[in-house]
């Protein structure tokens, strides 16, 4: 009788781990054998310097399977209380149309794509972003808009920085409307202090008393008041200062656009266009300005260019403004923005169209007017004369009773102070909401009837002089997709133009495009997480608190740091927040003169840009011929800095894809000269479970949760960049003016709009760590295995530029194409575009070394996919050989003409290579052909003929 397996034996082993890792055990053994080693442990010993090795398991709970992790997180979600939150302050209830929820937010074809640096395979989301810009331009009344910033508060800080760059006024003072949202004022204080600006927060009526280079006005303001800004804007222009206006997209459907009032910059949050509040984010900020300020504008701008056939094609325009090119001279350190959320907001506008959007705005405004009329009839004193959706009341001694009735009804109001209350209505409110509010403010037996009020004459709250008369959203895209069938097909059409992780490996170096597992994504749309206002009382967010506390504890265990600050909502924001903590630390010790930041020449562009934002002076440290930090140059630069040395920013493993043997000495040199070590966490995926930043010598580091910890890139955001700090820096990280966070100095101002940044995507990283547990080290090991496998397989055709100990690379490698360019004229761009014909997204081009490709396979790609990439690259090398031999002309070959489109093969073919060679160069391409939507995009034409709005594309055909 055969013995059947026991129940214990039938339990799934490493249930999630084996789903997350691409190569199975047999494939891993084959890869190890190719590298000449027997085990992963042997490879790690050869690769990771022994001085930094963490020779023990991570102190994390045992891994849960997917169902157990979801059940546990569901329990946390159930602890969050879903009250009706009318707190406002830039966050409002909204309805995400189901067709967008299911086909965009929950669709890996949208959320797993990368920032559209390769526009030929990103035309779908580029079109959605262009729609976002058109939406912003139309509603703000300005000439030019960007494709999103991180949140309203940081957008306001970017507006202040732009004003200083372009204003002719000589003042160093920036004025802030006292009735801006408090979180915005706090972020402005942080940025102004670092820049050395004087910030004046005062009543708008007092603006004339101040000489300024710019001002931020809120329209409608945080109290709900709507005032005519023209006199204030004229006064600002009279002293050659810029007028910046924070506004609300829904209100602008009914209000005169700020651009028509004379504003120079308009910004705000697009959250209420279909994006859940999510306890603070992620949300896309909009930002618009005048055409003349285009080169001073922060963030991504999508422009219309043309492709090699002369057809319209979209691309990211004016990239020379940005950190990845201009580094310390960049306008901003913005890298990751909020593309996925900007796309949701733009698609919300596409689906509803101008008439339905106006109806939604009118309904919100009508509800507010009825509430105002009812409370006025009962003698309540309203403090704002005009309004769109927000009312503020002086309630005096009645406040306690009102709040008690509100709690009984599970309604959150905004407590302004001990005598004033405010509330903001939104798309989710209805007549029943008003009935509840009448009872809350007036008690039982108030005698008001909503239907009766609605039948009478009620003032609408918007002054006649500020009622909108100009048209908006007239472009066909906003008037063609209003049935669900049409919208569904439009979304599919856009998605089909793009290449995302659900189709192929995206081997972008320094980007960690790993699996974003479905089980990790499921919780973000649970209403218990999605619907919470960021400023609800702590007890209503108990589930969030437990989840965040647990995630912070796990991140401490992984990194070795003593404290975590969750506020930064991108990696670049994390850099900025960490550098500010260092700056505050030095100031607390009387070392305010310490302002020099040492940065290796190989660093990410965000590093010098963030250092400049933190009021530091950047000094570059050279690298040696092997790509390591030149220790002699570091010692020299540190000694020269002396008591002005603030810190060193260093990425580990380095951006050259190696574990530097001297990292311990590097940290020691900086500490010996009184500096702090900031470790850029971009490459943390090669450290987890193998080494810890704090043990290596870092004092502070950010963690890209959208890289190492599985938050998807969303086509260019969202991201999260929490920072870990050692104990001595913990008091100096960001706090928040509305919800104080335990630990940091309560007087510290904020770096982002909400206390825990983009809190609603934190469940993704929680799920990943919960399901991996101590086996997170396996992910790091397989990432290193895959990178070395690729490096060694490709090295004969494309030399690997840098290697570390025992000729190993870390989790990524740099392929040197410069010799081929010199011999054949084929560039790294030609190879990148040709990979599209094989069905691949290109590796990172020309970073950190011009003329190279940086490849990072991650742990999630199977050996079959790695081999497919190798075969594509080797095939491309053979094609280059045909150019080299003269078989193909130097300027007319599949590489120079790549990528190839349907338009190429359906027209007259007059090229020295076959159609099959062009479009089906591999077996995979023959079986699963991905067609780029456009031919190679003309970047120069796009910048010289900048156009960043939706115009009928026929207008761009010559």
Swiss-Prot record:
GO terms for cellular component: cytosol; glycine cleavage complex. The modification N6-(pyridoxal phosphate)lysine is found at residue 707. It comes from the Bacteria. Signal peptide: none annotated. Keywords: Oxidoreductase, Pyridoxal phosphate. GO terms for molecular function: glycine binding; glycine dehydrogenase (decarboxylating) activity; pyridoxal phosphate binding. The keyword Oxidoreductase applies. InterPro entries: GcvP, GDC-P_C, GDC-P_N, GDC_P, PyrdxlP-dep_Trfase, PyrdxlP-dep_Trfase_major, PyrdxlP-dep_Trfase_small. The keyword Glycoprotein does not apply. It catalyses: N(6)-[(R)-lipoyl]-L-lysyl-[glycine-cleavage complex H protein] + glycine + H(+) = N(6)-[(R)-S(8)-aminomethyldihydrolipoyl]-L-lysyl-[glycine-cleavage complex H protein] + CO2. The glycine cleavage system is composed of four proteins: P, T, L and H. The glycine cleavage system catalyzes the degradation of glycine. The P protein binds the alpha-amino group of glycine through its pyridoxal phosphate cofactor; CO(2) is released and the remaining methylamine moiety is then transferred to the lipoamide cofactor of the H protein. Belongs to the GcvP family. NCBIfam families: gcvP. This is Glycine dehydrogenase (decarboxylating) 2. It comes from Pseudomonas aeruginosa (strain ATCC 15692 / DSM 22644 / CIP 104116 / JCM 14847 / LMG 12228 / 1C / PRS 101 / PAO1).
């Amino acid at each position: 009788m055969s013995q059947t397996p026991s129940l214990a034996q039938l339990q799934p082993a490493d249930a999630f781990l084996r789903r997350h890792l691409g190569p199975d055990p047999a494939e891993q053994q084959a890869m190890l054998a190719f590298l000449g080693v027997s085990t992963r442990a042997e490879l790690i010993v050869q690769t990771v310097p022994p001085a930094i090795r963490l020779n023990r398991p991570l102190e994390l709970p045992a891994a849960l399977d997917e169902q157990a992790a979801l059940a546990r997180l569901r329990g946390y979600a159930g602890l969050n209380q879903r009250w009706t939150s009318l707190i406002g302050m830039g966050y409002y209830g909204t309805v995400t149309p189901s067709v967008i929820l299911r086909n965009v937010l929950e669709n890996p074809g949208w959320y797993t794509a990368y920032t559209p640096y390769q526009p030929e395979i990103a035309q779908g989301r580029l079109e959605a972003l262009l729609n976002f810009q058109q939406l912003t331009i139309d509603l703000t009344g300005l000439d030019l808009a960007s494709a999103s910033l991180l949140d309203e508060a940081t957008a306001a800080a970017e507006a202040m920085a732009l004003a200083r760059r372009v204003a002719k006024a000589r003042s160093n003072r920036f004025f802030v409307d006292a009735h801006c949202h408090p979180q915005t004022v706090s972020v402005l204080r942080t940025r102004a202090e670092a820049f050395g600006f004087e910030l004046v927060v005062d009543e708008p009526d007092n603006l004339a008393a101040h000489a300024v280079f710019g001002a931020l006005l809120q329209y409608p303001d945080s109290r709900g008041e709507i005032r005519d800004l023209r006199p204030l804007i004229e006064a600002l222009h009279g002293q050659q200062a810029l007028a910046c206006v924070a506004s609300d997209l829904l209100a602008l459907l009914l209000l005169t656009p700020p651009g028509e009032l004379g504003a120079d910059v308009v910004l705000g949050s697009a959250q209420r266009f279909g994006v859940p509040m999510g306890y603070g984010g992620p949300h896309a900020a909009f930002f618009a300005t005048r055409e003349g300020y285009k080169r001073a504008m922060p963030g991504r701008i999508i422009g219309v260019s043309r492709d090699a056939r002369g057809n319209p094609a979209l691309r990211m325009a004016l990239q020379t403004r940005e950190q990845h090119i201009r580094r310390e001279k960049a306008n901003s350190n913005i890298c990751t923005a909020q593309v996925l959320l900007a796309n949701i907001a733009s698609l919300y506008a596409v689906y509803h169209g101008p008439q339905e959007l106006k109806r939604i705005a009118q309904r919100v405004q009508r509800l507010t007017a009825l509430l105002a009329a009812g409370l006025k009839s009962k003698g309540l004193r309203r403090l704002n004369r005009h309004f769109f959706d927000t009312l503020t009341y002086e309630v005096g001694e009645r406040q306690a009773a009102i709040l008690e009735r509100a709690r009984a009804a599970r309604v959150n109001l905004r407590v302004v102070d001990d005598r004033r209350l405010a509330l903001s209505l939104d798309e989710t409110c209805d007549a029943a909401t008003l009935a509840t509010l009448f009872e809350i403010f007036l008690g039982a037996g108030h005698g008001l009837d909503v239907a009766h009020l609605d039948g009478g004459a009620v003032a609408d709250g918007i002054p006649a002089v500020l009622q909108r008369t100009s048209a908006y959203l007239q472009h066909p895209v906003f008037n063609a997709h209003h049935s669900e069938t049409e919208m569904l097909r439009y979304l599919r059409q856009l998605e089909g133009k793009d290449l995302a992780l659900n189709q192929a490996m995206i081997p972008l170096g320094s980007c960690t495009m790993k699996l974003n597992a479905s089980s990790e994504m499921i919780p973000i749309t649970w209403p218990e997480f999605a619907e919470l206002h960021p400023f609800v009382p702590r007890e209503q967010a108990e589930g969030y608190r437990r989840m965040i506390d647990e995630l912070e504890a796990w991140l401490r265990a992984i990194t070795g740091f003593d404290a975590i600050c969750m506020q930064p909502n991108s990696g670049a924001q994390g850099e900025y927040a960490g550098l500010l903590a260092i700056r505050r630390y030095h100031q607390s010790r009387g070392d305010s003169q310490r302002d020099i930041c040492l940065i290796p020449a190989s660093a990410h562009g965000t590093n010098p840009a963030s250092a400049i934002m933190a009021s530091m002076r950047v000094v570059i440290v050279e690298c040696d011929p092997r790509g390591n930090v030149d220790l002699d140059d570091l010692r020299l630069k540190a000694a020269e800095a002396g008591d002005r040395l603030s810190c060193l920013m260093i990425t580990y493993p380095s951006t050259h894809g190696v574990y530097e043997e001297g990292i311990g000495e590097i940290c020691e040199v900086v500490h010996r000269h009184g500096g702090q070590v900031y470790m850029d966490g971009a490459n943390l995926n090669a450290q987890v479970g193998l080494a810890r930043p704090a043990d290596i010598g870092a004092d502070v580091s950010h963690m890209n949760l959208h890289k190492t910890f599985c938050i998807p890139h969303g086509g260019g955001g969202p991201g999260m960049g929490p920072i870990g700090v050692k104990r001595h820096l913990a008091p100096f990280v960001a706090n928040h003016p509305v919800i104080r966070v335990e630990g940091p100095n309560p007087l510290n101002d904020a770096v982002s709009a909400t206390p825990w940044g983009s809190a609603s995507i934190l469940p993704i990283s929680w799920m990943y760590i919960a399901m991996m547990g101590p086996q997170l080290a396996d992910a790091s090991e397989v990432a290193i295995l895959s990178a070395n496998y690729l490096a060694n397989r490709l090295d004969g055709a494309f030399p690997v530029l840098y290697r570390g100990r025992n000729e190993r690379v870390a989790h990524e490698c740099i392929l040197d194409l410069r010799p081929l360019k010199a011999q054949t004229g084929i560039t790294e761009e030609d190879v990148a575009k040709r990979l599209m014909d094989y069905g691949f997204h290109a590796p990172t081009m020309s970073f950190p070394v011009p003329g190279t490709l940086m490849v990072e396979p991650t742990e999630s790609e199977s050996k079959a996919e790695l081999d497919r990439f190798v075969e594509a690259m080797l095939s491309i090398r053979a094609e280059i050989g045909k150019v080299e031999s003269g078989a193909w002309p130097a300027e007319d070959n599949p590489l120079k003409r790549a990528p190839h489109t349907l338009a190429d093969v359906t027209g007259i073919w007059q090229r020295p290579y076959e159609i099959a060679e062009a479009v089906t160069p591999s077996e995979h391409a023959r079986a699963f052909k991905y067609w780029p939507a456009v031919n190679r995009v003309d970047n120069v034409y796009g910048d010289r003929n900048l156009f960043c709005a939706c115009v009928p594309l026929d207008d761009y055909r010559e």
